[in-house]
């Protein structure tokens, strides 16, 4: 029997901490949220366990752009220093211990710390950047390596700890823990109120999350609430209450029941750079999923799936990110299949394949970042962010399902998530796990051992394309083909062409139009927008593609709505392709638009847009 590869104690290259000497087991975060200073001020207390038998007299934690005031170890002042900054990983905090610590003994490290204006994990919004314009707002985004910019920590997904949060703010607070019911505390002299949260399931640092602003909540299921600006509460409640509990029950039947207690969704202001962030208990989500037609809630199916894949069973480093995102994309599509039927799973996978092709073309098919297992030594994991870990990861897991058969693979799924529950793993442990599980099934064992694992893990570019059920895309391809040859045919577009199509089918239609060797003329593009009502669509998944069709067609009338949209949404899925297309249309307009809106964007998004537009030198 093949044995699992032993874990390398330093298998995460994107941390400077000595987490092979000490391991965080619990963290208490105590912060005052100061909107006037755009700072978090307070302290963090780590309980650390010694992994060696008195071999180390120092604790090294990740930190980045922090103001450290003091450090105590077991209640006594300790010597400490911030080491020189090492890009892109920050300035390690070295804490000296008076004596080495015996194996398994615990120490308590208390660090007084403030965030600074250079913090890459927090975005502070002025009232005018929120939907109702009444109050300021702040939120965190710690994935991949930004928790170290909020407090010193072992900022690696290879370490998991329980958390408690003690936070004070003049505005309501959300955090990635279960709210602790408490007597209403009177406002402090500063006008702030205390909020407490507990996370009893151990989580990695990148799942630490806080937000504060003008936030109201409404129930969307028996264990779920939506939290959002009060002016958007009713529309968000309607958008999410139809599917959230159904998603939770569906995936619970595939793996095992949900373990986190509550599942809630925080709808953030529009500058949030991602579709969703799977922070435990409270998914942080983009307002772009609120399309007023319940057609964009696949994001919620994805984030709910992370409650098992990523949050409970975690990649040990960002080099193995596909273990988080490939599995989650696979599970999201299993939810879709259970609810909408198997053809819809294939339809979603066809859309995903297109995104994978786009990412590989953009990077180049020999690029390191098109591999399933990537080398991130000395690199910023944010730079590797693309659809590759999602869609190449999905394709691999889908291939495994088809290789050994769905019924057999379905028995492996709960085994895998039970085996690594609460743990972090790498790709080689995953391989060993599935080989071990099917060791007594001769047919499956032979197939899995014949599989070219090295090609799947390390070969750049596109993997073999699966055989998909195309029934839901064939009608769309046919319509796109009519538009492709519209000048040479009698085809007369009508609004009824869209009858019976869901939003994702319209997305595929527009993606096909964008692939035309000969773009539409400006007149044809405008006519498409009018007859199909794309120009007025409230669904951003549709409108951002239609704007690209117009820009490729050279339609000047599209420029103004493109600039407008780029100032209203900060989700990278939309703004990065739009800027690329706008730059090809008119680079000066693209650069001017970025300069106008750059302070609206989240620091992660802003940094990647600078690289897209100006190269590695930035603006």
Curated annotation (Swiss-Prot):
The keyword Zinc applies. It holds the Pfam family Leuk-A4-hydro_C. The keyword Zinc applies. Binds 1 zinc ion per subunit. Its EC number is 3.4.11.-, 3.3.2.10. Zn(2+) binds at residues 302, 306, 325. It comes from the Eukaryota. It catalyses: an epoxide + H2O = an ethanediol. It is found in: Cytoplasm; Nucleus. One of its GO terms (molecular function) is zinc ion binding. InterPro entries: Aminopeptidase_N-like_N (IPR045357), Aminopeptidase_N-like_N_sf (IPR042097), ARM-type_fold (IPR016024), LTA4H (IPR012777), LTA4H_cat (IPR049980), M1_LTA-4_hydro/amino_C_sf (IPR038502), M1_LTA4H (IPR034015), Peptidase_M1 (IPR001930). Its cofactor is Zn(2+). The active site is at residues 303, 390. GO terms for cellular component: cytosol; nucleus. Keywords: Cytoplasm, Hydrolase, Metal-binding, Metalloprotease, Nucleus, Protease, Zinc. SMART domains: Leuk-A4-hydro_C. GO terms for biological process: peptide catabolic process; proteolysis. A peptide binds at residues 141-143, 273-278. Aminopeptidase that preferentially cleaves di- and tripeptides. Also has low epoxide hydrolase activity (in vitro). Can hydrolyze the epoxide leukotriene LTA(4) but it forms preferentially 5,6-dihydroxy-7,9,11,14-eicosatetraenoic acid rather than the cytokine leukotriene B(4) as the product compared to the homologous mammalian enzyme (in vitro). NCBIfam families: leuko_A4_hydro. Belongs to the peptidase M1 family. This is Leucine aminopeptidase 2. It comes from Coccidioides immitis (strain RS) (Valley fever fungus). The lineage of its organism: Eukaryota, Fungi, Dikarya, Ascomycota, Pezizomycotina.
């Amino acid at each position: 029997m093949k044995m699992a590869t032993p874990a390398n104690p330093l298998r995460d290259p994107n941390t400077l901490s000595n987490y092979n000497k000490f391991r965080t087991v619990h963290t208490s975060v105590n912060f005052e949220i100061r909107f006037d200073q755009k700072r978090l001020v307070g302290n963090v207390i780590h309980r650390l366990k010694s992994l060696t038998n008195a071999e180390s007299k120092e604790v090294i934690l990740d930190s980045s752009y922090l103001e450290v005031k003091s450090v105590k170890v077991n209640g006594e002042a300790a010597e400490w220093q911030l080491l020189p900054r090492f890009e892109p990983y920050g300035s390690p905090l070295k804490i000296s211990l008076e004596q080495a610590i015996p194996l398994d003994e615990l120490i308590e490290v208390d660090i007084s710390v403030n965030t600074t204006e250079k913090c890459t994990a927090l975005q502070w919004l002025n009232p005018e950047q929120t939907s109702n314009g009444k109050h300021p707002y702040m939120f965190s985004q710690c994935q991949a390596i930004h928790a170290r910019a909020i407090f010193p920590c072992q900022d690696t997904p290879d370490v998991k700890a329980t958390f408690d949060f003690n936070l004070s703010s003049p505005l309501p607070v959300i955090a990635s823990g279960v709210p602790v019911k408490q007597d209403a505390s009177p406002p402090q002299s500063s006008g702030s109120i205390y909020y407490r949260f507990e996370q009893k399931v151990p989580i990695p640092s990148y799942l630490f999350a806080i937000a504060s602003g003008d936030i109201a909540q409404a129930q969307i299921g028996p264990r779920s609430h939506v939290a959002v600006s009060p002016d958007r509460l009713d529309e968000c409640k309607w958008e999410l209450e139809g599917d959230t509990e159904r998603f939770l029950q569906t995936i619970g039947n595939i793996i095992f029941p949900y373990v986190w207690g509550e599942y809630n969704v925080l709808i953030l202001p529009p500058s949030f750079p991602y579709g969703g962030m799977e922070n435990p208990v409270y998914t942080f989500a983009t307002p772009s999923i609120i399309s007023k037609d319940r057609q964009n809630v696949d994001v919620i199916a994805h984030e709910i799936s992370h409650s098992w894949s990523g949050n409970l069973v975690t990649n040990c480093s960002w080099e193995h990110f596909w273990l988080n995102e490939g599995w989650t994309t696979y599970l999201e599509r299993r939810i879709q299949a259970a609810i909408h039927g198997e053809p819809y799973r294939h339809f979603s996978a066809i859309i995903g394949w297109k995104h994978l092709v786009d990412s590989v073309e953009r990077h180049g098919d020999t690029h390191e970042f098109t591999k399933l297992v990537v080398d991130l030594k000395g690199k910023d994991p944010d730079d590797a962010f693309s659809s590759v870990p999602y869609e190449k990861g999905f394709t691999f897991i889908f291939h495994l399902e088809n290789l050994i058969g769905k019924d057999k693979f379905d028995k492996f799924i709960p085994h895998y998530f039970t085996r690594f529950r609460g743990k972090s793993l790498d790709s080689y442990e995953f391989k060993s796990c599935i080989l071990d599980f099917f060791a007594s099934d001769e047919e499956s064992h032979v197939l899995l051992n014949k599989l070219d694992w090295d090609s799947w893990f390390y070969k750049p570019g596109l993997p073999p394309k699966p055989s998909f059920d195309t029934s839901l895309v064939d009608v769309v391809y046919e319509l796109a083909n009519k538009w492709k040859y519209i000048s040479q045919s009698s085809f007369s577009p009508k609004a009824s062409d869209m009858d019976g199509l869901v939003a994702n089918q319209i997305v595929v239609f527009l993606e096909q139009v964008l692939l035309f060797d000969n773009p539409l003329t400006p007149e044809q593009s405008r006519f498409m927008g009018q007859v199909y009502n794309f120009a007025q669509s409230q669904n951003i998944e549709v409108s951002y593609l239609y704007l690209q069709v117009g820009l490729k067609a050279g339609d000047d009338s599209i420029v103004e709505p493109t600039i407008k949209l780029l100032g209203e949404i900060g989700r990278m899925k939309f703004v990065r392709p739009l800027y690329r297309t706008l730059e090809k249309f008119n680079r000066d307009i693209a650069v001017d638009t970025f300069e106008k809106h750059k302070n609206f964007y989240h620091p992660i998004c802003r940094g990647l847009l600078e690289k897209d537009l100006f190269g590695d030198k930035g603006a």
